[in-house]
Amino acid sequence: MKTKLTAMLLTVTGLVILAGGSLAASGNNYVNPDYRGGSSFNFVSAGPNVARCGAFPDNLELNFTGGGIDTEGGYNTAVFSACTNTTTNLVFDLKATDTYVGSGDQVFIEGDPFVLAPNPAKCFAANAHGVPFRVAGGTGGHAGATGHGRFHITSNLTPCNGQTPPSQVWFDGVIKLP
């Protein structure tokens, strides 16, 4: 009796794993309505990119790398870049690529323009409200992914306190696979 129960439990467990895995892998109009997570990221470089960001020195391209975890693919590495206007603190043309370590799948994210408002009294900058983003495709099992959501960013102001901790981003939204 114990052997039959164990065999039945293993069979049911296997079917659940296969069903869940095949749904995500094949798409079948898979929707994750609880797409959320967070990452830490570090500044890599800044410089002019007139074609993308506009006239220098008012506009710069910024590049970052980092990693985090989310409810879609688990642990991921991330690279992203954006343009910024150094006079207004407007951040625009934000593009990110999250690569899931377990599968190698990538998800491409594009963010709406926003202002990263500095707080010199406490040496940080943050956006004032959730910034809209779009899921703009991907690779592997996430090829053709779509979706949307909102993100928040906080960052230390290194010139204010001399510290260089990673910046933080967290988000929530929906991701869909075709």
Predicted regions and their residues:
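Beta-strand-enriched cores of mature, soluble protein domains
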Residues: A25-P178
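Bacterial N-terminal signal peptides
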Residues: L9-L18
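Bacterial N-terminal signal peptides that target proteins for export
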Residues: M1-L9
